[in-house]
């Protein structure tokens, strides 16, 4: 069992030894591989560096060429900056403008960068790349030789280890023999001891019988012991020698292994690295020097650019631009007045008839000028503060570029902008800058617009003040009586009430036009004319609401067929008149723009090109009926004219579109009005700005066209208007007797038209001034049944002159009434004026476009009746007395009746008729209110000729 344990122990030691040797062999092989790997890594590194240098050289060369092309492109004549002669003049002398000087310095710096990049490319592709190639060759050669040397040392080390194993085996063999010899010796000695122990009793018992035999056996045992002793000593000596050799080999191997691992391997690694780091450092130093030279040149160029930036001078540049382009920025010659066809008047005339219009306008302009001055000053203050804030934001943006670079040395040179708080702050600053810039541009637009308005208002105000001063001097030469006469001559009676078969407000406009024969409904024409005469300069027209009661009164009057805006309305009713006009269009059923066109019209507002949008809208509008299109053309031409006075009325096309968008183009049910109203307003604004291009011309669509210059409806010189103003006390009696006497006329009477008249319905006749009309019977106090040119219809009483015989009867009755009323000058004048023909201004002389124009038409000699001389002599006193009564009624006191002043506060005769109660044109006591009464049954309703 002991032998087996010993054998097992020996096998374990042998396996451990073999494992140790195996591990050492693996380490040595890995050392060779590691050395080769390090050499390969160095060669690859050097190859990568060489490739990098070559590629970097290519990049620098390409960059140099790109910079050169870039500089040449912007330096050549084909660049954007050199596309015009003006730019070429600036390019020849870039010092004229500081930005151009900066531009020239930047181009020069770019050229210098191109040259430096080309030089750097040559250095990188030439010496540095070649030097790296040489270093790679040296490293490869050294690594190969070092590996060979290391392989040799490893072989020697393994040979020593192999010798150690041999010595160990020799030692173990000799030691085994020594152990065996010792065992045999010990066995021989034990046998000898046994024989020696048995020999003593044997000797005492029978020495004589076995003496010789015992002696020979003892001798053999002694010789065996001696022999084995000698063998043991021999093997022991051999074992000792083998052990000594083994121990020496073991020490030698351990020393060799230690020397190899602690010295030889390190020396071999140093051999592989010989000159590598030094050579590589030299190459990188050369690269750094080349980059430093390029950077120094770039810093020098940037310094020059910084100096040019510091020399930026906005005021100086502006002065230089104005100096170079003096012919362009020099104010043009003033526009001169060019009189037409011998007109010698070259200044604003303030006649007595126009003073009531010009004086309020001058006062409105003065108040508007004061408000606009304050507003412009406030906007200017805000503009300066906003500009300062904007410049501060722009200036603070300069340092944000450096925030993108890291300050700590690392392999990455740029921060991650996704999570950088500085980038978020820069984004917020950018948004703040854009917001401030937008606000600044808005305020700049307001300031420039306000300053332009100030200049125009100031010029208008100065001209009007000069005209008013001249007018004050001229009015001193005109008597108050002449002014009052001319003032009365302007007044006129409203047209007789027309009866409509179609509803006006809330009805179908197309059917109303066809039924009434009015190309433009009277409410539209009259309201627009009233605003044209009184409200083009009215501030906030169509935006300020009128009095609801007044709006209702005007609407009801139009519903009755009357024109309440001829008399009874003043400039104070402008907002109410504008409200009536909007109310009319808003109440139409169906609306002017049918709902099926709403989507297509709204789609046109999305078109960015103005010409394309206008063409699209124009094509859509052709689908509307012609009468509706005529009214729309009339309305939007008026709105375009109204927007031209936005300096005074503050109603530009956008503001007017906001007012008329919901009125003309309501959003259909089921759609979001909030989301669509902006596009609706944009469409209406396009119609207001481009009416001439959107709507068809007169040649394509005949009908009335809005005229910018209108005059009040012309009136009779001495008609019922003066009778109502001067003889108000005698009027009830006269009106009571006139219908009774006129109804007594029997038979057909021929009357002469003293004014032209255009029928508004199919039942009303149209005629011209001077036409002979046949009157059959009196239909009402305002209308006659008669015929003209073979057509029968209704003829207005106030537009004709009765025959001489019939007139005498009326005059006689009037004189009798005047005698009953007394012999006062007022009554005499009233009775004289009420019965004579009215040879005066036509109430509505129609122009070629169908609009009423003011024209004075003298009566024919045979129709003219001269005023009685006594009446003429008493007219001045009558007017003064009547004006005195008017002054007392208005609270002016008796002082104003004695010496009427022709100044700006000229008193006006009080209007004798109110809305719906026009005495001269009102229905008689028995006049029917229904259409059947005004237009009796059985009348020939043949349409009027066109």
Curated annotation (Swiss-Prot):
GO terms for biological process: cytoskeleton organization; negative regulation of axon extension; negative regulation of cell migration; negative regulation of fibroblast migration; nervous system development; regulation of small GTPase mediated signal transduction; Rho protein signal transduction. The record marks 543 as: Arginine finger. Keywords: Coiled coil, Cytoplasm, GTPase activation, Phosphoprotein, SH3 domain. The keyword Cell membrane does not apply. InterPro entries: AH/BAR_dom_sf, F_BAR, FCH_dom, Rho_GTPase_activation_prot, RhoGAP_dom, SH3-like_dom_sf, SH3_domain, SLIT-ROBO_RhoGAP. SMART domains: FCH (SM00055), RhoGAP (SM00324), SH3 (SM00326). Residues 507-695 form the Rho-GAP domain. The modification Phosphoserine is found at residues 860, 901, 906. Residues 202-211, 407-419, 924-934 have a biased composition (Low complexity). Signal peptide: none annotated. Residues 187-196 have a biased composition (Basic and acidic residues). Residues 746-805 form the SH3 domain. It is found in: Cytoplasm. SUPFAM superfamilies: BAR/IMD domain-like, GTPase activation domain, GAP, SH3-domain. Residues 128-195 form a coiled coil. GO terms for cellular component: cytoplasm; cytosol; growth cone; microtubule; nucleoplasm. Residues 901-910 have a biased composition (Pro residues). CDD domains: F-BAR_srGAP (cd07656), SH3_srGAP4 (cd11956). Residues 19-317 form the F-BAR domain. One of its GO terms (molecular function) is identical protein binding. Interacts with NCKAP1L. Inhibitory effect on stress fiber organization. May down-regulate Rho-like GTPase in hematopoietic cells. This is Rho GTPase-activating protein 4. It comes from Homo sapiens (Human). The lineage of its organism: Eukaryota, Metazoa, Chordata, Craniata, Vertebrata.
């Amino acid at each position: 069992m002991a032998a087996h344990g010993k054998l097992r122990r020996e096998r374990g030691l042998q396996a451990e030894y073999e494992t140790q040797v195996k591990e050492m062999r693996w380490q040595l092989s890995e050392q060779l591989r590691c050395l080769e790997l390090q050499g390969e890594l160095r060669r690859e590194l050097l190859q990568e560096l060489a490739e990098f240098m070559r590629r970097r050289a290519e990049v620098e060369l390409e960059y140099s060429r790109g910079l050169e092309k870039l500089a040449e492109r912007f330096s050549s004549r084909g660049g954007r900056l050199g596309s015009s002669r003006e730019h070429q003049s600036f390019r020849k002398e870039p010092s004229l403008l500081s930005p151009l000087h900066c531009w020239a310095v930047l181009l020069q710096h770019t050229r210098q960068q191109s040259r430096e990049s080309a030089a750097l490319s040559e250095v990188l592709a030439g010496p540095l790349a070649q030097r790296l190639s040489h270093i790679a060759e040296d490293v490869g050669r050294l690594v190969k030789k070092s590996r060979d040397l290391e392989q040799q040392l490893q072989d020697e080390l393994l040979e020593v280890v192999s010798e150690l194993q041999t010595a160990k085996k020799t030692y173990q063999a000799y030691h085994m023999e020594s152990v065996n010899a010792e065992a045999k010796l010990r066995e021989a000695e034990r046998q000898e001891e046994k024989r020696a122990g048995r020999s003593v009793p044997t000797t005492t018992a029978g020495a004589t019988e076995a003496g010789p035999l015992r002696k020979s056996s003892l001798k053999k045992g002694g010789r065996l012991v001696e022999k084995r002793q000698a063998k043991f000593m021999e093997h022991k000596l051999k074992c000792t020698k083998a052990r000594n050799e083994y121990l020496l080999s073991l020490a030698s191997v351990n020393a060799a292994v230690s020397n190899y691992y602690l010295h030889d391997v390190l020396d071999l690694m140093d051999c592989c690295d010989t000159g590598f780091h030094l050579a590589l450092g030299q190459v990188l130093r050369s690269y750094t020097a080349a980059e430093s030279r390029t950077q120094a040149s770039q810093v020098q160029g940037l310094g020059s650019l910084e100096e040019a930036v510091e020399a930026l001078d906005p005021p100086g540049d502006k002065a230089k631009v104005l100096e170079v382009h003096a012919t362009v920025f020099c104010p043009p010659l003033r526009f001169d007045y060019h009189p037409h066809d011998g007109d010698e008047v070259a200044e604003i005339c303030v006649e007595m008839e126009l003073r009531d219009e010009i004086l309020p306008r001058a006062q409105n302009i003065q108040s508007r000028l004061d408000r606009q001055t304050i507003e412009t000053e406030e906007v200017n203050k805000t503009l300066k503060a906003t500009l300062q804030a904007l410049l501060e934001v722009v200036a603070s943006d300069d340092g944000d570029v450096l925030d993108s670079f890291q300050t700590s040395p690392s392999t990455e040179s740029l921060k991650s902008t996704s999570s950088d708080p500085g980038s978020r702050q820069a984004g917020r600053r950018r948004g703040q800058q854009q917001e401030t810039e937008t606000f600044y541009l808005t305020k700049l637009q307001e300031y420039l617009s306000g300053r332009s308005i100030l200049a125009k208002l100031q010029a208008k105000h100065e001209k009007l003040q000069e005209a008013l001063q001249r007018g004050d001097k001229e009015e001193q030469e005109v008597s108050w009586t002449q002014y009052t006469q001319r003032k009365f001559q302007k007044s006129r009676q409203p047209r007789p009430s027309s009866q409509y078969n179609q509803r006006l407000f809330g009805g179908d406009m197309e059917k109303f036009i066809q039924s009434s024969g009015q190309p433009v409904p009277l409410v539209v024409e009259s309201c627009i004319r009233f605003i044209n005469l009184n409200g083009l300069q009215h501030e906030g027209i169509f935006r300020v609401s009128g009095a609801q009661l007044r709006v209702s009164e005007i609407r009801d009057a139009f519903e009755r067929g009357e024109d309440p805006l001829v008399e009874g309305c003043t400039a104070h009713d402008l907002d109410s008149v504008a409200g009536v006009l909007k109310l009319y269009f808003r109440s139409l059923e169906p609306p002017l723009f049918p709902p099926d066109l709403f989507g297509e019209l709204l789609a046109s507002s999305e078109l960015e090109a103005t010409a394309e949008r206008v063409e699209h809208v124009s094509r859509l509008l052709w689908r509307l009926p012609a009468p509706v299109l005529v009214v729309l053309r009339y309305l939007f031409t008026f709105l375009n004219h109204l927007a031209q006075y936005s300096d005074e009325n503050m109603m530009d096309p956008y503001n007017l579109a906001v007012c008329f968008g919901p009125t003309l183009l309501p959003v259909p049910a089921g759609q979001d009005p909030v989301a669509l109203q902006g596009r609706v307003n944009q469409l209406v604004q396009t119609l207001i700005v481009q009416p001439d291009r959107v709507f068809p011309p007169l040649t394509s669509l005949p009908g009335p066209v809005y005229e910018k210059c209108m005059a009040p409806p012309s009136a009779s010189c001495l008609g019922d208007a003066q009778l109502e103003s001067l003889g108000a006390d005698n009027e009830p009696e006269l009106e009571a007797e006139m219908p009774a006497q006129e109804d007594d006329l029997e038979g057909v009477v021929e009357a002469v038209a003293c004014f032209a008249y255009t029928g508004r319905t199919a039942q009303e006749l149209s005629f011209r001034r001077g036409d002979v009309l046949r009157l059959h019977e009196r239909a009402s106090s305002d209308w006659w049944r008669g015929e003209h040119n073979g057509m029968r219809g209704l003829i207005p009483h106030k537009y004709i002159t009765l025959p001489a015989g019939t007139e005498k009867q009326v005059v006689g009755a009037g004189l009798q009434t005047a005698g009953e009323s007394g012999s006062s000058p007022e009554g005499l004048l009233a009775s004289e004026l009420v019965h004579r023909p009215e040879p005066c201004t036509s109430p509505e002389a129609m122009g070629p476009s169908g609009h009423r124009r003011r024209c004075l038409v003298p009566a024919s000699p045979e129709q003219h009746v001269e005023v009685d001389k006594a009446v003429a002599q008493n007219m001045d006193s009558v007017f003064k007395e009547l004006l005195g009564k008017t002054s007392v009624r208005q609270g002016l006191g008796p002082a104003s009746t004695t010496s009427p002043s022709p100044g700006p506060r000229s008193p006006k005769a009080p209007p004798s008729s109110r809305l719906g109660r026009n005495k001269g044109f009102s229905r008689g006591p028995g006049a029917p209110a229904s259409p059947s009464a005004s237009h009796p049954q059985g009348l020939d309703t043949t349409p009027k000729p066109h």
